[in-house]
Amino acid sequence: MARMHARKRGKSGSKRPPRTAPPIWLEYTVEDIENLVVKLRKEGYSTAMIGTILRDQYGIPTVKLFRDPDNPNRKLTITRILEKHGLAPEIPEDLMFLIKRAVNLRKHLEQHPKDLHSMRGLQLIESKIRRLVKYYKRKGKLPKDWRYDPEQAKLLVR
């Protein structure tokens, strides 16, 4: 598949083995995983970091192999666990990381106003932000009146 803002193809990478159920050797139950996720979140880890810690330190390949106990038709995810326990961030993490990148790039452009390559990069990042905001408004993760404002973003990131 092609890249979003370039006319190049994507780089190939390793693929996760196709699996529909947790491995037999895995000793953790859904409750154990939920407790671990909540504990790690309270320690201040992001969802991406929680997934990495579960994989590397606890041997849990992915949380999505388990079924949600509240709704057996849905896969369990770290975000759903955090929402269930009231620990999910107000702004989704992928959007927050893009906003942080945009704020840092704006700070760079204040010091280097003629850096046109970075200016273009900022335009691309902000278009990704707008696209993601539209998606999250549609899904109900953000309020309908939420807007991305670069000045407010500085305060949001701090």
Swiss-Prot record:
UniProt superkingdom: Archaea
Q: Which UniProt keywords apply?
A: Ribonucleoprotein, Ribosomal protein
- What GO molecular function annotation could you give as one example from this UniProt entry? structural constituent of ribosome
Q: Which Pfam families match?
A: Ribosomal_S13_N, Ribosomal_S15
InterPro entries (alphabetical): Ribosomal_uS15, Ribosomal_uS15_arc_euk, Ribosomal_uS15_N, uS15_NS1_RNA-bd_sf
Q: Name one GO cellular component term.
A: cytosolic small ribosomal subunit
Give the GO biological process terms. translation
Region Disordered: start-end pairs? 1-21
- Sorted alphabetically, which SUPFAM superfamilies does this protein's record hold? S15/NS1 RNA-binding domain
Q: Where is the composition biased (Basic residues)?
A: 1-18
The family database entries (CDD domains) matched by this protein are listed as:
Ribosomal_S15p_S13e
Which NCBIfam families does the entry mention? PRK08561.1 (NF006331)
User: To which protein family does this belong?
Assistant: Belongs to the universal ribosomal protein uS15 family.
Tell me how this protein assembles. Part of the 30S ribosomal subunit.
Q: What is this protein called?
A: Small ribosomal subunit protein uS15
Organism ancestry = Archaea, Methanobacteriati, Methanobacteriota, Thermococci, Thermococcales
Instruction: Write the gene name.
Output: rps15
